[in-house]
């Protein structure tokens, strides 16, 4: 029987929907008519003997395909399902991008932050990305976005062009920003992660579900990040109203975080959901990767929902 490994932890302006990354797939779905090393036991499950607060889970909790991991509030260990391996993560990459921007340029409640002025080269880059079918938001030379607006464009409609803008603004160059992404990953214990770009477009950006849980946990400690990913939509100066690709938001206890999808990564979703388990309100922070389906965004979302339903039913 496949089981769980427990890992200790410290601590629509877009022409395409989220995470296409230049490869065909359908638009984000709307599921609702209304407005997420140890020793082996006899069962074959792995357990970490230095922590007793994480329960051993039956294999039926986990998605049948791809990989997944999660942690519940009150626990110090990540529950890790089978098939963990470094794999493309598509736009889930943007969790780390946003985390680094907010780490380097913190925002408090009510603050919009510095202003970023978009250039002709940013517009040319956007046109190139649009031609490749990437997820972008429309921009114009001279357009001004606050840091908060840029993060909203990054995280809601999943704009690859804004990921590039933020990377250069934060670190001076994309290459330097990617170096900072990898340094942050190492500091968080994300040992099976390698970032090569700030948007997740490149298939060489790889990670595991367990590693991504670590950065999601850190990002969700930042109130501005948590607030942005809980928004169903936002309005940008040129792009206008853009929708969050997370259509589970506000349903079944899901409060964010980030979708991702392409043909290499499949359907991916980094999420947080709040459910009542054993009479107690419990926060579940998790990630599913590599979910199959013709509609990859839907596959990631529904893979996460099904897993959370099973967790809550244990």
Where are each of the predicted segments found?
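Secretory targeting and sorting signals
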Residues: 1-15
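Penicillin-recognizing serine hydrolase domain
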Residues: 17-78, 173-314
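Export/targeting segments at the very N-terminus of extracytoplasmic proteins
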Residues: 69-87, 99-107
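Second-shell loop/turn segments in exported
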Residues: 80-88, 134-141, 149-153, 164-172, ...
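Active-site SXXK
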Residues: 89-116, 212
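Short glycine/serine- and small hydrophobic-enriched flexible loop segments
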Residues: 99-107, 168-171, 217-218, 309
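Conserved catalytic neighborhood of penicillin-recognizing serine enzymes
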Residues: 124-164, 241-257, 261, 276
């Amino acid at each position: 029987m496949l089981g769980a490994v427990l890992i200790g932890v410290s601590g629509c302006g877009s022409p395409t929907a989220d995470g296409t990354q230049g490869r065909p797939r359908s638009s984000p779905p709307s599921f609702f008519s209304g407005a997420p090393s140890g020793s082996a036991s006899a069962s074959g499950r792995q357990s970490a003997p230095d922590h007793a607060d994480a329960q051993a889970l039956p294999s039926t909790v986990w998605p049948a395909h791809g990989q997944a991991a999660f942690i519940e509030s009150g626990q110090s260990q990540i529950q890790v399902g089978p098939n963990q391996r470094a794999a493309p993560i598509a736009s889930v990459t943007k969790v780390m991008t946003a985390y680094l921007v907010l780490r380097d340029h913190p925002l408090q409640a009510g603050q919009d932050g510095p202003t970023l002025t978009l250039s002709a080269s940013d517009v040319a880059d956007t046109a190139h990305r649009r031609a490749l079918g990437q997820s972008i938001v429309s921009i114009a030379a001279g357009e001004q976005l606050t840091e908060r607006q840029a993060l909203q464009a990054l995280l809601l409609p999943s704009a690859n062009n804004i990921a590039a803008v933020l990377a250069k603004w934060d670190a001076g160059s994309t290459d330097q920003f990617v170096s900072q992404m990898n340094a942050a990953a190492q500091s968080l214990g994300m040992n099976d992660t390698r970032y090569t770009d700030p948007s997740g477009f490149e298939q060489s950006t790889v990670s595991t579900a367990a590693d991504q849980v670590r950065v999601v946990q850190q990002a969700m400690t930042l109130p501005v990040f948590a607030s942005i990913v809980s928004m169903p939509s936002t309005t940008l100066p040129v792009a206008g109203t853009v929708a969050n690709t997370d259509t589970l938001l506000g349903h079944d206890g899901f409060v964010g975080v980030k979708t991702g999808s392409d043909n290499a990564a499949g359907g991916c979703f980094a999420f947080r959901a709040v459910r009542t388990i054993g009479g107690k309100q419990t926060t579940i922070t998790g990630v599913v990767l590599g979910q199959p389906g013709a509609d990859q965004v839907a596959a990631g979302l529904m893979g996460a929902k099904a897993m959370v339903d099973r967790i809550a039913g244990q």
